[in-house]
Every structure is written in C-alpha cells, then in structure tokens.
Amino acid sequence: MSTSKRKRGDDANWSKRVTKKKPSSAGLKRAGSKADRPSLQIQTLQHAGTTMITVPSGGVCDLINTYARGSDEGNRHTSETLTYKIAVDYHFVADAAACPYSNTGTGVMWLVYDTTPGGQAPTPQTIFAYPDTLKAWPATWKVSRELCHRFVVKRRWLFNMETDGRIGSDIPPSNASWKPCKRNIYFHKFTSGLGVRTQWKNVTDGGVGAIQRGALYMVIAPGNGLTFTAHGQTRLYFKSVGNQ
C-alpha cells in the first residue's frame, strides 16, 4: 500500500495564500450612520432699514427659531428641529430720544428657551417679572420663580453704551475736538452647544403659534434708559430631525 506525500512546493504555495478580510459589521454600521445623518442647515434673520429692531426701555422679545415648513435650506423639512449654534452680529445705535443726554448704561441680551409657548410670544416682564422700579436696570433681572419651569436662560451677555449730549450730525467748533463715546457699538457673539429641540404643529408657517414645544427667543434690554436701535443679523445653525 503506497502513501502519497505532500511536496515542498505545495507547502510553499499554501503558505503564500492570502486570505481576504471581511469588513466588520461595526464598520459598516458606522459608515451607514454617517450617511444617514441630516445635514446642518442655516437660517439668517436680517434686521436693517424698515426691519431694524427698536429696543425700548423694558426691553424687547423676539422669536428667532422661525423655521417655516419647506424645501429650502432655511426651512424645516420635518416635524422636529434641533438648533445647535447661533451667530449674532449687530450695530447698536443710540436713538434720538437718548442722544440729548449725557448717560451710560449696561444693556443685556439673552437667549431664552420656552418649553411651552402657548401660541404667543411673552414680554420681557413676563419672563423676568421685574418690578417697574427696576425697569431701567436689566442686569438685575432674574427669571420669575413661578415660571422657572417654563423659561430657561441659555445665554446672557452684557454690553455698555454711552451718550454725551450730542447727536451724530453735530459738528465741533474749529478750535475744539470731541472725544468719541460709545453711542454706536458693534455687538458680536457666537455660541454653540445650545441643543434646542423644537416640536412643530402640523402647519406650514414658522411663527410662535406653530410651535408645540421649544421656542427660542432673543431678548434685548437697554440699561439706564439708554434706548437704541439694532441693525444686523442673526444666523441660526439647525437640523431637521424626526418624522416627516
């Protein structure tokens, strides 16, 4: 009875064989999840000319996550949105009522989250419940204790403005000079990590009445009665998530 032996050449060829590696299921899942992520969208709100923001004593409150339903980049595509980042760029200009006085004031800008807006934007006094005696001092305002479950301050920024009793068109005499004051200031802020989730009703507009849960307001108040107008833009970075 004869036995067959494997030749050395066969052993060498066997060792040279390269086995193909199969891609792991974890790698496939990671690649797929990146492809399925919704892209970051941008909405820009411009305020200039006839759409400038007038900031009276006591402040102003405006809804900023105004994502109407649609197919454009600034529209919401689903019934839920997530606002991640906000860029604020404005020029604050003391108005005609404030310029005739020599004054300085510390104003405040807030980003306020409203869990249940109820179809109507609140006033600054509704949010902060300040007494009339503190109307001119917004740096002292705090969210109302009774409504702290509804309103959450996401960001708070201070700024200083000045007036010297003159208006911008005044011309100094030839033998004198006037040092500048902060009658007109540039205000810039960029903030991330907001994580504002908004649930929308089955309507197409982007007003506060269309929000079921999660409105985001920009609140601005002047300090010491130094009223002004705001000219510029707010840019919001968000995603459309959830169901169509």
UniProtKB/Swiss-Prot annotation:
Coarse class of the primary localization is: virion
UniProt keywords, alphabetically: Capsid protein, DNA-binding, Host nucleus, T=1 icosahedral capsid protein, Viral penetration into host nucleus, Virion, Virus entry into host cell
Q: Taxonomically, which superkingdom?
A: Viruses
Which GO terms fall under biological process for this protein?
symbiont entry into host cell; viral penetration into host nucleus
Where is the motif Bipartite nuclear localization signal annotated in this sequence?
1-24
Known InterPro entries for this protein? Gemcoat_MSV (IPR000143), GV_A/BR1_coat (IPR000263), Viral_coat (IPR029053)
Region listing for Disordered, in residue ranges: 1-39
* Family (UniProt): Belongs to the geminiviridae capsid protein family.
Q: From the Swiss-Prot or TrEMBL record, give the protein name.
A: Capsid protein
Taxonomic source organism:
Maize streak virus genotype A (isolate Kenya)
